[in-house]
Amino acid sequence: MSGLVDAQFPDLARRTVTRYGSGWDHELFCVGGKWIFRFPRRAERVPWLAREIQITAIAAETLGTAVPVFERVGEPCEAFPYLFVGYRLVPGVGADLACARDLAGLAADIGAVLAALHRVDPSRVPPTPDGWEREPWSELRTELAAVADLVRPLLGPDLLAQAEPYLAGRAAEPPQDGPRRFIHNDICPDHLIVDAGTGRLNGLIDFTDAMVGDPALDFAGLIGLGGYRFIDRVVAGYDLPLADGFGAKLEWLSRVLTLTWLAEAAAYDPAGVGKLLSWVIRAFSH
């Protein structure tokens, strides 16, 4: 990838290029220790990335440097067939990797960031390419039931008994009522970048899945950081009203999503099973 970056961004020529990581949708490379370049893994992801260029610019108007703006946009070429982007590295580590974690301070930071994000005018948010905004939560329930056999062998007897109504698709989804806001829609420890020493929030990354939706979706992913007690601390620092029934939504989403993520790990990322299993345990510790 170094030749590709050199050709399109001459000011970065001859900088050291190292692999930074990979996800479901992108390969990431660090250039010169200061820039992260994201390359789509499949053609279907290009419209999402093009949309994310707009999304991050909108979010950065409110959150400033906490959101990495795609300052560099690479064009498709013979060396790489898709649009790609570059942004300044947000210093720090994933929120679950900090050596010293000030959980109270981090919760306050996250609450403030989510409130600011959720205040953005939702009419400014471009629609998702696949129409996710219109999907009912019943689809989450049926998707989990379809992969439940990957999860059942991973759960102890007591946890399995608690999870079975969700795995069997019998735990009905709560109403999708209340205000619809601009949400990140993929809040998790990997996307909350914190100072490695203090554990305080430095930035929020990866707006690929951002959309207009229920704010409860942005709280459910926090289960991986400290369970419901931690989420309560985040809510205390969140100064927007939450709809009646927020607690029921949070519990249902936390359980359905963590079980689904555990199934994905079992299928595609066995090394991540232990971490995701701990999230499931937290989701059912309520």
Give short role names for the model-derived ranges.
Residues 1-10:
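Juxta-kinase regulatory segment immediately upstream of eukaryotic protein kinase catalytic domains
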Residues 9-10, 62-65, 153-158, 239-244:
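Short helix-capping segments at alpha-helix termini
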Residues 95, 108, 209-286:
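Helix-rich C-terminal or lid/interface subdomains of diverse kinases
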Residues 98, 134, 148-181:
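ATP-dependent phospho-/nucleotidyl transfer catalytic cores
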Residues 24-31, 37, 70, 167-219:
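Active-site acidic catalytic loop and adjacent metal/ATP-binding pocket
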Residues 63-65, 102-103, 178, 229, ...:
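Membrane-helix interface segments
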Residues 14-139, 149-154:
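ATP-binding pocket architecture of kinase catalytic cores
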